[in-house]
Amino acid sequence: KYIFDENFFFFFEEIDLCKRIKNINENIFVFNKIKIFHEGGKGVDTKIAQNYSDFRHWNYYWSRFYYHKKHYGFIYSLFIHLSKLIRFFISFLALYFFSKEKFRKNKFRFFGLFSSIIGIKSSVSKDILNKN
């Protein structure tokens, strides 16, 4: 009856599903006594971990924009994300000479958000995981 939106890839899919269920006045049950500890990439080698980190940064901002666009419209989503887009762009340019790690993080955030704004599908981000 309720399915995940396959346009989401990696982030916001459960938030979207809950919002859609709530919009039709159905119930959502929360078990707040359950705790899960996740170490996030601790079991992979450094190169794979870097690709995974790039992938996460790209997908988080892609999904964040898409979620807001889907539920509140393109203009609203653009309005709330425009300052981030500008900040990520300036940061990734400025940090190139000072911090390669922060440069890389902001570059993937910028391109994930920009890709969502111009309508590129989130599935292209899988290529980030396979790069050398």
Positions of predicted regions on the chain:
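Bacterial peptidoglycan biogenesis and beta-lactam-recognition machinery
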Residues: Y2-D5, I24
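C-terminal extensions
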Residues: K1, L17, I128-N132
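Terminal low-complexity segments of carbohydrate-biosynthetic enzymes
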Residues: S63, K84-N132
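Acidic donor-binding loop at a coil-to-helix junction in glycosyltransferase catalytic cores
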Residues: I3, F10-L17, R56
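Generic alpha-helical structural signal
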Residues: E6-N7, K102
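Active-site-adjacent helix/loop segment of glycosyltransferases
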Residues: K19, N23-K100
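Solvent-exposed, flexible loop/coil residues
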Residues: F8, F12, G40-G41
